[in-house]
A protein has these predicted regions:
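Conserved small/polar residues in nucleotide/adenosyl-binding loops
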Residues: 198-205
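Loop/turn elements at helix/coil->beta-strand transitions in domains of secreted/extracellular proteins
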Residues: 170-172, 192-195
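Beta1/beta-strand and adjacent pyrophosphate-binding region of the FAD-binding site
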Residues: 168-178
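Bacterial Sec-dependent N-terminal signal peptides
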Residues: 1-7
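Aromatic pocket-lining residues of Rossmann-like dinucleotide-binding sites
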Residues: 189
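Hydrophobic/small residue at the entry helix of a nucleotide-binding pocket
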Residues: 181
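Extracytoplasmic
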Residues: 7-165
Length: 209
């Protein structure tokens, strides 16, 4: 359950869904969006819905946005999904607005009739739907696209742990990249009893693990 912060704004980080269904956490574009996000990759078959319980400060009509992108704006491409609340699907297909960059895609409005509802992400194409954040607001506001302001919104409205403790540690081996060589190096280090740290999706190496 996401706790509420702010006035009539509900912010959802999809990677915190309690039931991710067939969706998985991905971080390939973390340099562009700031945090991990949910990815639906079903090899052409829509994956199971991701669901969670979500609390609202008050009932009524809410505007809805999802932070995503249209991967192939020419039409008919992958990466499309829908959002439903208590089984009521918002009449909008996200990832289909022709904007080929990460941005807030407006999905229209939906009426919330209970303080606690089930939120679902519904994959449509089975190919790489991605959702970085969802925002509900009583007012039709302008949401930020720059990462610094987005982080401020996350800290203000989202379920963000503000007491993160960073621990410095020493490692015998650092594996950068998750290809065949990186995986073999990490496995062999573990067999030899070395302390192995595997760095997934390093921006510099463009790892695809």
């Amino acid at each position: 359950i996401i706790p509420l912060h702010g006035q009539s704004i509900v912010w959802v980080e999809p990677e915190l869904f309690s039931n991710k269904g067939g969706w998985s956490i991905d971080a390939q574009f973390i340099d562009q969006v700031g945090t991990p996000y949910l990815l639906a990759h079903g090899l052409g078959e829509p994956v199971q819905n991701a669901t969670m319980s979500l609390a609202f400060p008050e009932t009524g009509l809410y505007h809805v946005w999802a932070r995503t992108k249209d991967w192939i704006p020419e039409g008919g491409g992958p990466g499309k999904f829908m959002i439903s609340l208590e089984g009521n699907t918002i009449d909008h297909i996200f990832g289909s607005d022709g904007v080929n960059r990460w941005h807030w895609e407006y999905g229209g409005t939906i009426r919330i009739d209970a303080p606690m509802i089930e939120l679902s992400l519904q994959d449509i194409t089975g190919f790489d739907a991605r959702c970085d954040a969802i925002c509900f607001s009583k007012e039709k506001i302008i949401l930020p696209d720059d990462l610094q302001t987005i982080d401020e919104y996350r800290n203000k409205y989202g379920e963000i742990d503000k007491n993160i403790i960073y621990e410095k540690r020493e490692f015998d081996l650092v594996v950068a990249g998750g290809g065949v060589a990186g995986i073999c190096a990490a496995v062999q280090a573990a067999r030899l009893g070395s302390v192995s740290y595997t760095h997934l999706r390093a921006h510099e190496t463009r790892s695809n693990l």
